[in-house]
């Protein structure tokens, strides 16, 4: 089991040398590797327990920033390889992971969109395909490179069974930079407003 902390650009002032935006892509290529990127402290605890009980390799990705509690509903249940539907919608499906789940939910509230908190590997193909069939459009949101991460995993799942337009929101093909975490998330359009604007443009 591998636990990685301070992932993504939200490490902030530590800068590009400390910002890992490629780790998920690297880990996805390892056979049998399970990748978990919890959205809040509730899910983080559930992920640690699931990793401990799982008989195989697991990569746990933890962010640095404090995030809102999302998974505090009485019916919340974490399962490896299963996404959690946080909001029902009809116009577009937003699939997010890690700290970007809160940004995605903020955008989804304004856009009448589905909101799904996803494990990355194994990806919940059944849930994602069903949601894509319902809305006809999918957006992925992650604090990671748009190359090889959640967006790529979702595209892999949809390509054969439900090819629909997909917008991948994340760090483009660039290195990070130094700055306050909130400012960097805004610059890379990974905060709630940035996600909202990109999804709105995609849905025109």
What role is predicted for each listed range?
Residues 1-93:
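Conserved thiamine diphosphate
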Residues 11-12, 63-204:
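Thiamine diphosphate
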